[in-house]
Amino acid sequence: MPLFATNPFDQDVEKATSEMNTAEDWGLILDICDKVGQSRTGPKDCLRSIMRRVNHKDPHVAMQALTLLGACVSNCGKIFHLEVCSRDFASEVSNVLNKGHPKVCEKLKALMVEWTDEFKNDPQLSLISAMIKNLKEQGVTFPAIGSQAAEQAKASPALVAKDPGTVANKKEEEDLAKAIELSLKEQRQQSTTLSTLYPSTSSLLTNHQHEGRKVRAIYDFEAAEDNELTFKAGEIITVLDDSDPNWWKGETHQGIGLFPSNFVTADLTAEPEMIKTEKKTVQFSDDVQVETIEPEPEPAFIDEDKMDQLLQMLQSTDPSDDQPDLPELLHLEAMCHQMGPLIDEKLEDIDRKHSELSELNVKVMEALSLYTKLMNEDPMYSMYAKLQNQPYYMQSSGVSGSQVYAGPPPSGAYLVAGNAQMSHLQSYSLPPEQLSSLSQAVVPPSANPALPSQQTQAAYPNTMVSSVQGNTYPSQAPVYSPPPAATAAAATADVTLYQNAGPNMPQVPNYNLTSSTLPQPGGSQQPPQPQQPYSQKALL
């Protein structure tokens, strides 16, 4: 295959657009259109060959190539339309419009306008309209669709006649036109000579009428234009032309000009004195200027005062009155009508702003609701971190190494006696297993020698201690805390028994436990077995 393959359409296109053609060969043009769809590259090859002839230096060849291009667009279908709506064709069009002959450019622009109208419903062929838009922005003018200029540009101009017979026929037509013109001139000359030798009857009557037609001026008239006649009242004016009923042409000693017919009279016997008593003078002053004053349209704006004033006037007007409306009322009504579109726009703006504020309000309420929800939730992680660092018990600074525990109360809770300055008392809730072990522990006699001689006292402290259910955490041993109702019932029953028994109650020994028997925070003693945790609540 050669490097530069020949275009199969070059020979036919050159023949259809030859410089020697005197008319379009439509048979060959239609054959080219049929040949386009026979191969896959047919549309591109045909368009390339046609545009090569459009760029020809001979305008006659370029015009024939544009005619062939229009025929291909009309007959070859969408396969050729896609090639026309390509970037290559757009660059070729720009080159032709910049360097081509004016007639060629006009015809190409007319074809593009026609194609834009045909391709407007197909989005794949929108490049033509975009190309026209870009060229218009660059200053290129395009004719309107269906205009006379577009039709004339699309029409093929008269081809240059190369046939001698055609040239001869054209020359004969020109000679015939010249002969007709000469004969008409001779007829006009003969008619003028006859009219000079033998005057016509109409001309004699007209001359006789002009010679005997005289009128007298009854008013003074001063010419305002150059072709008008100035005269005074009482002057005799010779009428030259009275074909116009309003303005006649007359002659005086001052010259010839036009004058109004109602300023003269045909009665020539009237005395000048009588005419002077009845005459009316009309004078025109150049200083007088007639101006039509039109009220300037006031700019429309929303004025509540004017609307209130109009409503007040309408309420005070009697509808049964036959008198016309006041001009002020009509003026205010017109102005209020002009405010209508502005009021509609203002309402739309207010509605839009109200919608935006409503959306913002919803967002703010959602944010506040989320904030309130987060604030009401238990800070579980912070409480856990705080309580994790606390020991299982609190040892008072004012107490020695041993702590005195009273007898086991009914609720099973042990109170640690501490310093009197302590503002809080800590309650320990021990599981039942530890309570049983504590109750069975053997206390040496030397631990508390004063036990036999002491009076038995109730093991209830004066300080009120709130029983709070403890929180259980993964790092601490769960403790059992009886329900508040059970604790309160047990405490009430014990107090009642104590009051009824009095001094006859048996003495209960106090257990004096050393600190070594209690669980230490850092000791090696194993914590009690974990139990099922109950509810977790924050400390009150």
Curated annotation (Swiss-Prot):
Signal peptide residues on this chain, from the entry's feature table: none
Domain VHS as annotated: residue spans: 16-143
User: What does this protein do, in the record's words?
Assistant: Involved in intracellular signal transduction mediated by cytokines and growth factors. Upon IL-2 and GM-CSL stimulation, it plays a role in signaling leading to DNA synthesis and MYC induction. May also play a role in T-cell development. Involved in down-regulation of receptor tyrosine kinase via multivesicular body (MVBs) when complexed with HGS (ESCRT-0 complex). The ESCRT-0 complex binds ubiquitin and acts as a sorting machinery that recognizes ubiquitinated receptors and transfers them to further sequential lysosomal sorting/trafficking processes.
The UniProt record lists the SH3 domain at: 210-269
Question: What sequence ranges are listed for the domain ITAM?
Answer: 370-387
Q: Which GO terms describe its cellular component?
A: cytosol; early endosome membrane; ESCRT-0 complex; intracellular membrane-bounded organelle
Q: Which residues carry this modification: Phosphotyrosine?
A: 198, 381, 384
Effect of mutating residue 212 to D: In a colorectal cancer sample; somatic mutation
Boundaries of each UIM domain copy? Answer: 171-190
Q: Does the keyword Phosphoprotein apply?
A: yes
Q: What is this protein called?
A: Signal transducing adapter molecule 1
Question: Where in the cell does this protein reside?
Answer: Cytoplasm; Early endosome membrane
One protein family per Pfam:
VHS
Phosphoserine carried by residues: 156
Describe how it is modified after translation.
Phosphorylated on Tyr-198. Phosphorylated in response to IL2, IL3, IL4, IL7, CSF2/GM-CSF, EGF and PDGFB. Phosphorylated by activated PDGFRB. Ubiquitinated by ITCH.
Species = Homo sapiens
Membrane spanning segments where?
Answer: none
Compositionally biased tracts (Polar residues)? 500-518
